[in-house]
């Protein structure tokens, strides 16, 4: 059994997912974590001499080994690592919703302090692609930004939604790091510098990512799912009723391969095999886990796995010795495994007994057939998918029709599908009087992604008490919520995107048949669909010159179609021209609002500064009156002071609301740049994103819309 080699009780609470280890003097590892009241604590048990107090750094009154770094803002992320080329020790990086601080703990100095308008929800430090110097990369409000050791902004791009997790990993095995980004739109995106390489769709917000080895990485979702990918292939995943607070890769059983270490919200720590997800080690804290890191904390040349809880408990574990032979569990956990295996054996014995009873019933079919669930040998489970428009009683949906070709009935159906049903599964259990050989299940995909439907059906006779289980998998195409039956009165879409391909029309037809739910194979690439989810039309047309025009008012749909078609036809670089009048009009209004909110923000900041000066003067006058015994004037000044203070609080509320509204508008602007990029592929996409950002920086709104339409700055 593996036990902690050290346990510490720190007198400071720890914010979840904000734990790091840094060698700030280049030698001694120090546990660093965000704590309450906008502070970061640095635990350094190695140099116990009194440490100097600086403008940000102060000694903790509760623990002599802890120094407190005052950020004066709510900390949203932190990390530590080598940033400067000449620095001997690690740099501490602390992100908030408005700023990024790079701090040299050893010299008590700011390396740089940058304002970040999009906030910093996640941070990672390291080398990216061909960029020579290490970057502090932050993910915020739909944007990614990378700073070097001087605070220069060397990297910027946009992503689909608010960023929640980041990790650097050699995803393409070319010897250079790619950036993996987990966001609130449930996607894991892979960036080769500012170029999007690929994306994997999950079914919840991606809260944590960690590099394991090679192109393999672990991930955690907000719904309690953890798992492992190797590139775009998912090896395994498990789901828990608790939330994964932190994941980390560490070789705990000393077999040369790292395991996925997960810290959970109920205080549990577990280590799972990267190949199978099998649990090889468990331990428990009395409170939620805050973070999992690694370091040579005892300075004895051995790396320990260090786990922390939100209450400030710290435990260190050494990898298992050879004598343990990989047996890291305690005896009680082994007993749990024996109980689980016994239960599984009992279930299998029961299933075997059912088969034996069915076999005994075969000679006398007339008597036992109905009860024992014996069915004809030619019984098959048939499935069909069809598009159903909205009616008075039901929303528009995809109808899954499950049927048998003979007199047998379907007693129950279980469907497992990611991201469609709550809890990822759906059970249909018709009442006894409604039993038949056909079950219809309405399916409403929330967005345009391909979904595998894993179907299990219980099939038997009308009076059976035992049933045969049929299993079948059916894929729902990506663009299944689009119907060929079009309302003639529907208005023509005003938005469009146009691009050229060098491929046969038959290949486009193949793509249509593979990605849309069509009643029968079509042989023309010129089609019109009705969008069931958002309304409106989608027209796809192909000229003999190879020019494709997609007409829709939904810019997101246009981007999805361009990316899907380019992937199917293996197009690496694709330039496109687009025009979405309705969306561009909304964006222009949003940009005007951004300017207005910026102006209001500056006025409110100036007003608050004036009020602060008034309060300072009023306080001095009130204290003078008190010392002179002038109670009448003192009372008058304190009443005025109370009124000023109340005004200041009200102004702060207005400023806070203004700031939140500004953030929402900035998110819309970043998403607009992302959408304009998704209408192109490869280098043209990167060029559009960069050019759009430059246009916004220079406040050149007309150039911004020209770039979004034409895809180039020269047009």
From Swiss-Prot:
A GO cellular component entry from the record: BBSome
Quaternary structure and interacting proteins, as annotated: Part of BBSome complex.
Keywords: Cell membrane, Cell projection, Cilium, Cytoplasm, Cytoskeleton, Membrane
Organism of origin: Danio rerio
Pfam families assigned: BBS2_CtH, BBS2_GAE, BBS2_hp, BBS2_Mid, BBS2_N, BBS2_pf
Protein known as: BBSome complex member BBS2
BP GO terms, sorted: cilium assembly; determination of left/right symmetry; gastrulation; intracellular transport; Kupffer's vesicle development; melanosome transport; non-motile cilium assembly; photoreceptor cell maintenance
Origin superkingdom: Eukaryota
Coiled-coil regions, chain positions: none
Function: The BBSome complex is thought to function as a coat complex required for sorting of specific membrane proteins to the primary cilia.
Cytoplasm is among the record's keywords: yes
InterPro entries assigned: Bardet-Biedl_syndrome_2_prot, BBS2_CtH_dom, BBS2_GAE_dom, BBS2_hp_dom, BBS2_Mid, BBS2_N, BBS2_pf_dom, WD40/YVTN_repeat-like_dom_sf
The keyword Cytoplasm is annotated on this UniProt entry: yes
Entry's localization field: Cell projection, Cilium membrane; Cytoplasm; Cytoplasm, Cytoskeleton, Microtubule organizing center, Centrosome, Centriolar satellite
Signal peptide range: none
């Amino acid at each position: 059994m593996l036990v902690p080699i050290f346990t510490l009780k720190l007198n400071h609470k720890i914010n979840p997912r904000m734990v790091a280890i840094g060698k700030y003097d280049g030698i001694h590892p120090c546990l660093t974590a965000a704590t309450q009241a906008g502070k970061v604590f640095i635990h350094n048990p190695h140099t116990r001499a009194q440490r100097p107090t600086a403008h940000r750094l102060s000694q903790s009154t509760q623990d002599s080994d802890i120094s407190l770094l005052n950020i004066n803002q709510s900390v949203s992320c932190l990390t530590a690592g080598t940033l400067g080329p000449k620095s001997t020790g690690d740099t501490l990086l602390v992100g908030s919703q408005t700023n990024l601080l790079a701090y040299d703990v050893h010299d008590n100095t700011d390396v740089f302090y940058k304002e970040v308008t999009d906030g910093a929800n996640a941070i990672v430090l390291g080398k990216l692609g061909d960029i020579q110097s290490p970057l502090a990369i932050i993910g915020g409000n739909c944007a990614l930004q990378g700073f070097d050791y001087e605070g220069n902004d060397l990297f910027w791009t946009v992503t689909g939604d608010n960023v929640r997790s980041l990790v650097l990993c050699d995803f393409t095995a070319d010897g250079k790091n790619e950036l993996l980004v987990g966001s609130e739109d449930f996607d894991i995106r892979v960036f080769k510098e500012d170029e999007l390489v690929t994306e994997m769709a999950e079914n919840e917000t991606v809260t944590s990512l960690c590099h394991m080895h090679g192109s393999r990485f672990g991930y955690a979702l907000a719904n309690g799912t953890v798992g492992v990918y190797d590139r775009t292939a998912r090896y395994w995943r498990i789901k828990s009723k608790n939330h994964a607070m932190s994941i980390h890769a560490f070789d705990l059983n000393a077999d040369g391969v790292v395991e996925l270490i997960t810290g959970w919200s109920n205080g549990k720590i577990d280590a799972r095999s990267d190949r199978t997800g099998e649990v090889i080690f468990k331990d428990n804290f009395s409170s939620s886990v805050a973070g999992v890191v690694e370091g040579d904390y005892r300075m004895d040349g051995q790396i320990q796995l260090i786990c922390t809880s939100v209450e400030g408990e710290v435990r260190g574990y050494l990898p298992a010795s050879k004598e343990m032979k990989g047996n890291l569990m305690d005896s009680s956990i082994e007993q749990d495994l024996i109980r689980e295996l016994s239960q599984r054996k009992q279930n299998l014995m029961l299933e075997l007994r059912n088969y034996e009873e069915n076999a005994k019933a075969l000679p006398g079919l007339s008597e036992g057939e109905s009860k024992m669930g014996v069915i004809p040998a030619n019984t098959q489970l048939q499935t069909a998918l069809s598009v159903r428009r909205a009616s008075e009683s039901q929303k528009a949906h995809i109808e899954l029709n499950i049927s048998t070709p003979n007199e047998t009935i379907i007693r129950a159906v279980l469907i497992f599908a990611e991201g469609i049903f709550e809890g990822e599964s759906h059970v249909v259990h018709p009442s006894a009087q409604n039993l038949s050989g056909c079950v219809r299940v309405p399916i409403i995909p929330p967005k345009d992604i391909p979904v595998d439907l894993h179907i299990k059906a219980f099939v038997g006779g009308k009076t059976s008490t035992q049933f045969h289980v049929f299993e079948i998998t059916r894929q729902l195409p990506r663009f299944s919520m689009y119907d060929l039956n079009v309302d003639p009165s529907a208005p023509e879409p005003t938005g469009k995107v146009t691009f050229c391909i060098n491929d046969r029309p038959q290949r486009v037809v193949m793509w249509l048949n593979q990605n849309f739910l069509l009643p029968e194979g079509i042989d023309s690439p010129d089609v019109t669909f009705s969008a069931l989810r958002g309304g409106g039309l989608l027209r796809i047309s192909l000229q003999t010159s190879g020019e494709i025009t997609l007409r829709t008012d939904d810019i997101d749909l246009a981007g999805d179609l361009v990316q899907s078609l380019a992937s199917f036809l293996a197009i690496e670089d694709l330039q496109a021209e687009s025009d979405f009048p309705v969306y561009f009009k909304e964006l222009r209004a949003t940009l005007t609002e951004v300017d207005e909110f910026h102006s209001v923000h500056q006025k409110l900041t100036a007003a608050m500064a004036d009020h602060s000066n008034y309060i300072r003067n009023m306080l001095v006058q009130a204290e003078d009156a008190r010392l002179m015994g002038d109670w009448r004037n003192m009372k008058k000044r304190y009443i005025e002071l109370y009124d000023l203070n109340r005004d200041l609080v009200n102004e702060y509320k207005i400023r806070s609301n203004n700031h939140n509204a500004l953030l929402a508008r900035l998110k819309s602007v970043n998403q607009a740049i992302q959408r304009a990029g998704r209408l192109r592929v490869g280098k043209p996409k990167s060029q559009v994103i960069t050019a759009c950002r430059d246009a916004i920086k220079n406040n050149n709104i007309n150039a911004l819309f020209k770039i979004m339409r034409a895809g180039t700055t020269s047009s």
